């Protein structure tokens, strides 16, 4: 579940700017915001503090314990928890990804590696937001998406006065069994880019399930709602196109650069009134004017 820094972005600017509460953004604008924050979470606070501030984020706290890392970001209106994804050079991250056994919790079975990462981080996170009363938003890419999902679940059970508003994940693996997924009743926008291989692990035959509303980007990078057969055909088309570009689609599609590019295109189409049936499909979240 790779997210090496040099692969994430060459330019540290943000398109999104926070000048109003996040709840007043439509779901595509929120998705772009959290995709950019998930991408920037791979950088040190010294590298991204000015970027966050320029985007309207005044509160910036980086927390880390035993290789598990996250940013706690805040404005006057919102609190955001952005979990960092896998860094191949971090043994703790690699170990977390590889450990696919489940561990029993009071609300269901969880991936033991992902749960251990949150165990490392949770005391610091809970202490930092224990008096927060602003809406809380959770996001992450790859391993960070799994951690964000688990953190949101723990937030629901904690004494933190503010409940999670939503989770936004990009290329996230499955995190737990059906019982756990049914427990995490938090709006979850789960982005999947065509052949992103990380979204297919751990396997369902081990009891793992995905949570939330899947938002699928097809081989053309457009929002789609496809049947199983059409999705298989679309994925094969994606593999073929990648081979022509001398790329391995399963890994190329996991890049946050691609996620951000496709979400930005979808948002631009909406703003220009060029949304097609895929964008307004009733099974996808509604896009409302702002």
Each predicted region: which residue ranges?
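Non-catalytic, mobile gating and regulatory segments of ester bond hydrolases
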Residues: 1-139, 143-290
